[in-house]
Amino acid sequence: VAARANAMQSACEENPGTMAAIIGLDNEKIEEVCAIIKDEIVIPANYNCNGQVVVSGSLKGVEIACQLLKEAGAKRALPLQVGGAFHSPLMEPARVKLAEAIQNTKFNEGICPIYQNVTGQAVTSPDIIKANLISQLTAPVRWTQTMENMIVNGLTDVIEVGPGTVLQGLFKKTGTELQLSS
């Protein structure tokens, strides 16, 4: 955890960036708009639920994306108070540093499936878990797919640990009957 935090802080200083929540526009349109911004880095970074995606990238790239996405019909484009462009190519220096630390750490075969947001899939293989932990720094968070896969695999109860109930709200938007608590 400390190695990841230090690597990400260093990457934020090396490659300043930010993130913004885009509300009320379909994922494909957000992807399309981000792809046409050529001179700056901006990508969909968090697929939270249908109609709610967070974009991440350079300061100028996110600013341009917010403007274009509002013009394309987004209900809201809200800049987030974050320290960097997480889950984007701007985190590549952190990914390189974290890869070394993870590769030098022994992982055992999982005794239960772990859903990793980089793919949304359940895994138990130490090699796949390691690869996904490394990839998550520069790859999008596929929370929508993660929720869908958990539900398909029989999820019935969700206990949210930590402050707030953000994840419970996202699960409610799936329209699936689940027992939610924190």
Regions found by a protein language model. Give the residues of each.
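Alpha/beta catalytic cores of group-transfer enzymes, especially the acyltransferase/condensing modules
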Residues: 1-139
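Acyltransferase/transacylase module recognition
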Residues: 103-182
